[in-house]
Amino acid sequence: MKDLLKFLKAQTKTEEFDAIKIALASPDMIRSWSFGEVKKPETINYRTFKPERDGLFCARIFGPVKDYECLCGKYKRLKHRGVICEKCGVEVTQTKVRRERMGHIELASPTAHIWFLKSLPSRIGLLLDMPLRDIERVLYFESYVVIEGGMTNLERRQILTEEQYLDALEEFGDEFDAKMGAEAIQALLKNMDLEAECEILREELNETNSETKRKKLTKRIKLLEAFVQSGNKPEWMILTVLPVLPPDLRPLVPLDGGRFATSDLNDLYRRVINRNNRLKRLLDLAAPDIIVRNEKRMLQEAVDALLDNGRRGRAITGSNKRPLKSLADMIKGKQGRFRQNLLGKRVDYSGRSVITVGPYLRLHQCGLPKKMALELFKPFIYGKLELRGLATTIKAAKKMVEREEAVVWDILDEVIREHPVLLNRAPTLHRLGIQAFEPVLIEGKAIQLHPLVCAAYNADFDGDQMAVHVPLTLEAQLEARALMMSTNNILSPANGEPIIVPSQDVVLGLYYMTRDCVNAKGEGMVLTGPKEAERIYRAGLASLHARVKVRITEEIRNTEGESITRTSIIDTTVGRAILWMIVPQGLPYSIVNQPLGKKAISKMLNTCYRILGLKPTVIFADQIMYTGFAYAARSGASVGIDDMVIPEAKAGIIEEAETEVAEIQEQFQSGLVTAGERYNKVIDIWAAANERVAKAMMDNLSVEDVVNRDGVVEQQVSFNSIFMMADSGARGSAAQIRQLAGMRGLMAKPDGSIIETPITANFREGLNVLQYFISTHGARKGLADTALKTANSGYLTRRLVDVAQDLVVTEDDCGTHNGIVMTPVIEGGDVKEPLRDRVLGRVTAEEVIKPGSADILVPRNTLLDEKWCDLLEENSVDSVKVRSVVSCETDFGVCANCYGRDLARGHIINKGEAVGVIAAQSIGEPGTQLTMRTFHIGGAASRAAAESSIQVKNKGSLKLSNVKFVTNAAGKLVITSRNTELKLIDEFGRTKESYKVPYGAVMAKGDGAEVQGGETVANWDPHIMPVVTEVSGFIRFADMVDGQTITRQTDELTGLSSLVVLDSAERTGSGKDLRPALKIVDAKGNDVLIPGTDMPAQYFLPGKAIVQLEDGIQIGAGDTLARIPQESSGTKDITGGLPRVADLFEARRPKEPAILAEISGIISFGKETKGKRRLVISPLDGSDAYEEMIPKWRQLNVFEGEVVERGDVVSDGPESPHDILRLRGVHAVTRYITNEVQEVYRLQGVKINDKHIEVIVRQMLRKGTIVDAGSTDFLEGEQAEMSRVKIANRKLAAEGKIEATFTRDLLGITKASLATESFISAASFQETTRVLTEAAVAGKRDELRGLKENVIVGRLIPAGTGYAYHQDRMRRKAQGEAPVVPQVSADEATANLAELLNAGFGNNKG
């Protein structure tokens, strides 16, 4: 028996491999795989059910139908193994060879492989340099192609129609050779000399100048070189032998009633064989040409359908009008081999059930129904029963378990102890969607879940179901316990904050417990400690909220672990003293001496984790939960209708609003305001009224009057249940209370526009029919949105995972000095995100210098933890250069220092961590919370849009950056630069506020000036763009001819006249070439020069500019010469939410992108064309100018003669990330994408760490375009992997040769996924056919670097615990050791493992 096992093992041995190569199969190769030719289309004999000989299921070719038994039954049993039966010709072996052995069909006529023909760009077409239409006409026997021209005037590859061919035959006879069909194409491909062709093309490439031609040549050269290097022969793209899939992979299953269910492939193969045999017969009979041709065409079509049905012409359908599933369909799409069977498999040993609350569980436990546990752990129980000698055989054990004898339950208890199970809730959006717990057996049929892990699973108990999986092997159990246990996943990988935070009841309980109340029972007592506080509370001598003095002993520990103990009498409340009893030692009392809301509790857990570590935090979290539930139950905070107090002022406010609306309506009817203005104003009025009602209501709800001990009335925070729920963060929000007790306010239509009649009622008063009807609009839209959102969000996550899946931490330090400069995110007057939050957990890229000195505050390569961040804050540092994955120099993967802290663990990241997948999940998981809609700016929003001044909020000093200004006669500054930034610095040098100052703004105070809070520092008119003069002098009109370039207009109200410059479209013939301008001259009439240049001060005026000055008037620097009216940006739609995130990651170019200056230099305008202006930028160093045509309707931000820097905005609009990368570099584009994505998430209140977005950006920047190949093998204009280019350049630099130069490319995530090095990963993502075709032609090797490829080939992934295994393999390979394959059979190994496990279980008894 042992020998037999050894033999079996030898059969199933897998070779260790490092890479997978895909290439074209040559006919000989196909024959070498084959075990015989399939000659007949028959499948099985319908009477005997035996396979027909030489048919598609033939036992002689493919192997026996039953194990170790030949077809005719002469040889049965194992002893005849390997014998070939002389009667039926079947080899006696296992039947599973029918899954492995292939057959083949010898085609009577060559056939083109449809993938290489039709998959665009057509490989055959590109190789032969013939259009696809022509090749198809040849293949499907419509025309001839010349193969050898001989001495005639016919070109090779020339297409001839039937008539032309006959004419040529008459004229030249046998001089030339022309054929039709696949034979012709095959002959053409065979005759190609690839290397010679390559040389010719390279020469052509050097000579040609046309861009399109270059592109085409490069494509052809790449393809030819791929063929040469891979050893593929072009003629192999034409099939002469067709392989036949093993029969068990295209089974034929008998159904009841004598019918059969068959795989579609059998039908397709039958067609091919039938047509092939018919063609052979016709050729033997020497049938007329036309019949043979027709048959050949039919054969070509049959082979096409087998390989890829529906790719050409109509798909071949089966009996039920459904297209047949071809070989290509088997592998592509969601139901294909890749996604259905290789990347996601079904799991045995799993169960699922509804979940319910387990409030008494510990954090690492889950309640598992006994019935389910018994089923899941059956094999373990059988083993235990046998081991104990309670059952003699497995069968007996089975019976015992089925009878559910008492001993079985005892054994189940033992088996389950210390054996973790995995719980998973679909959809698993991030890695916390599967966690491990220790099961506790419970009665009933529902799984019990610990309430604190609900946030991670996004679970609630309204009928959610969860799946249970059992890790079987020791390794799996170890990983479940060490890595996946719920107690090890306290922090969220997305932002590093605790994810095990109490919510709802628990928060309410703690909040209620820690509130204080004036004049409560027992106020003013002095207690000896928390124990006494609890005693008097239980005895009913004092209320929970009573303000008392308590003696507290606290041990305060800082992050270094030093601790000091101090005892003091503290003013606090009874409830807080009781809560202090569960707080672990080492935290200060101040942490509970406050009303605890959700934020405070989260902060408390975070502090606890940072100071005390994992174990105390877990215990503390559990205690918080138990306490919270207990006191929430005691609080009796329930909601009654009287809790929704409607403010008395409501009626008055609504009345006022209605009068205002009526007034506006009158103005509209008398024609004073436009319809649009009326609508906007009405909406503004109602929005303001709603705010006022809400404010009145909240003021009313949030405080109550009480009498204190001295009999004086004072106000205290209200104990209204609804208010407490919202205030603590347990449930509900001010906006929801507003709908209950204020007014519902304005509603939106499904298209997002606002209905102008608001709902003045609230839910307590109830809605009337009209109000209810208006409400339904929004509600239904919400439901429809949610459904769409889920699908879109899931697809975004899938693309993100796909692009980042191969990014793993592979080394400790790449040694780079590059990084990105982090500053706090400031919008207007608010610090949206302080510097501390942005740099926490990053590594410094260079020393941080103490502001105002030369001392080093933080050395280079320091991981900034909480301590360092405190130091930065104390010294008010406001920018730090930190390492980033975008600038990491590691070739494949990233280094730990560039990534920084592992957010879910709180220390620097470990090698082998799959940061790419974590990033993708962190960005994708909150996707369902983002909105789907496009916002219309209307009403309230548009008011904010047209700002006209900057008012600072805090006291401090001003700091202007990128500023140019002139001082006008009044001594004020007039800004003449485009992207000026104004910052407000406090006395510690920290940036508090930041604003953009537009061109032409007037500022009373300049750089460095002190300002008070609330002071207005800049003013401008938002509706016009001024032209500001930088010099003083007299105005001289140039080319300002009345009626030709300008026209006079008189304002009806004021009677003032002004000149308006005509648009070039409105000018008459002679005025077209004139360029109206204002020159500034001195008293003598000489040109005044612009300070610091030798250019005369003259200001060209664009069309529509308004001039209110007369010729010859004296003006001073900083005066406005002309005004250009700005069309208000109107109601532009802002794409928000999920679509915006998708657009950013797909790097889509916006519809009308901002135009950026390509080079630095001076602006001027060249000759105009009909619809466009010519913008010319002349560099200051006098090199060649850059020209660009810009449509006339685009508003330009620059005037003639202005100096711009490369990358400055010339015309406003959304910026295109590609332009930013080209003109401002990698860091600018990283910053842009990060900030824009964060903006969307910040609106929804979702926190995601920047580094996740940077990880995705790094993957988008993987490719570069070669500008100059140097001594490398790259082609100019070729897109190559950056890591490849860098490696090649390093090698060349070492040899002292010319390195390649390149520009970085930004690819969208879908494109980047498809352009990955690994063809297996790309094929399993999208466009499987195209990817595989391309890879096969190039003979690509997949190095199996990423996670996906390794999952697909069935290996451990090179990340996490599999990282060590792969490193070990690499090391052995480098040392040239043979792979260690244990010479044990599978059965032996299982037996050994069972012994080990059982031994382990046996010892547990004691």
UniProtKB/Swiss-Prot annotation:
For activity, the cofactor(s) needed are: Mg(2+); Zn(2+)
EC class: transferase
Q: What does the record give as EC number? A: 2.7.7.6
Q: Per UniProt, what is one GO molecular function of this protein?
A: zinc ion binding
Q: Name one GO biological process term.
A: DNA-templated transcription
Q: Where, in this chain's numbering, is Mg(2+) bound?
A: 460, 462, 464
Show the GO cellular component annotation of the record. DNA-directed RNA polymerase complex
Q: Which InterPro entries does the annotation name? A: DNA-dir_RpoC_beta_prime, DNA-dir_RpoC_beta_prime_bact, RNA_pol_asu, RNA_pol_N, RNA_pol_Rpb1_1, RNA_pol_Rpb1_3, RNA_pol_Rpb1_3_sf, RNA_pol_Rpb1_4
Please name the CDD domains in this protein's record: RNAP_beta'_C, RNAP_beta'_N
What does the Swiss-Prot or TrEMBL cofactor note state?
Binds 1 Mg(2+) ion per subunit. Binds 2 Zn(2+) ions per subunit.
Q: Which Pfam families match?
A: RNA_pol_Rpb1_1, RNA_pol_Rpb1_2, RNA_pol_Rpb1_3, RNA_pol_Rpb1_4, RNA_pol_Rpb1_5
Q: Which residues bind Zn(2+) 2?
A: 814, 888, 895, 898
Which segments cross the bilayer? none
Q: Which reaction does it catalyse?
A: RNA(n) + a ribonucleoside 5'-triphosphate = RNA(n+1) + diphosphate
What keywords is this UniProt entry annotated with?
DNA-directed RNA polymerase, Magnesium, Metal-binding, Nucleotidyltransferase, Transcription, Transferase, Zinc
Q: Which residues bind Zn(2+) 1?
A: 70, 72, 85, 88
Quaternary structure note: The RNAP catalytic core consists of 2 alpha, 1 beta, 1 beta' and 1 omega subunit. When a sigma factor is associated with the core the holoenzyme is formed, which can initiate transcription.
Main role?
DNA-dependent RNA polymerase catalyzes the transcription of DNA into RNA using the four ribonucleoside triphosphates as substrates.
Belongs to which family?
Belongs to the RNA polymerase beta' chain family.
Official protein name in the record: DNA-directed RNA polymerase subunit beta'
State the organism of origin. Yersinia pestis
